[in-house]
Amino acid sequence: MHNDPTDTAFLHQAIELAVQNAAAGQLPFGALIVRDGEVLGMGVNRELDEHDPTAHAEVDAIRNACRALSTRDLTGAVLVSSCEPCALCHVTAAVAGISRVVYAAPKELAMAILGPGDDGSNLLTDMQQALRALVPGQVEHVPTDGDGRPFERFAERGRP
């Protein structure tokens, strides 16, 4: 694994998207799709607004990048997420050709602040572990200052 010096700057952007989403009463997750130092797409978790369990921030960012570029192929791009992506997001990134994923907050931090989810998160965690075994080194945790801010903001507002 390697840590690109620009990872931290983009991770801070993803964290800020997540903080803004939490302040708006939505789930506290944000993501970017980046290639060659350019942001191709941004996304936030829209599950509550859209009543859609697949509307994760990472999937939203991938959809927006694909739409902006009129393609389904994001080869060479990096998924930058405010929090450790679940299996759904990992698979979506792989299908889009994204070869590298970096994230700020580990899922354990999110669960410590938000509590365990009621959304099948155990299933997603099991699937996540299986995926990582298939493609070792693709997903990288980059410790980032402020990675807990989105969850703290969400907890301050209370669950919707």
Regions found by a protein language model. Name each.
Residues 1-21, 91-160:
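Zinc-dependent deaminase
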Residues 14, 18-21, 31, 57, ...:
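Small-residue (primarily alanine) positions within well-ordered alpha-helices
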Residues 23-26:
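A short helix-loop-beta-strand connector motif used in the catalytic cores of GNAT acetyltransferases and
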Residues 29-37:
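Short beta-strand scaffold segments in enzyme catalytic cores
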Residues 46-59:
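A short, polar/charged loop-to-alpha-helix boundary motif
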Residues 47, 81, 105:
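Residues that line or immediately flank small-molecule/substrate-binding pockets and catalytic motifs
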Residues 63-96, 100:
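Helix-adjacent hinge/juxtasegments
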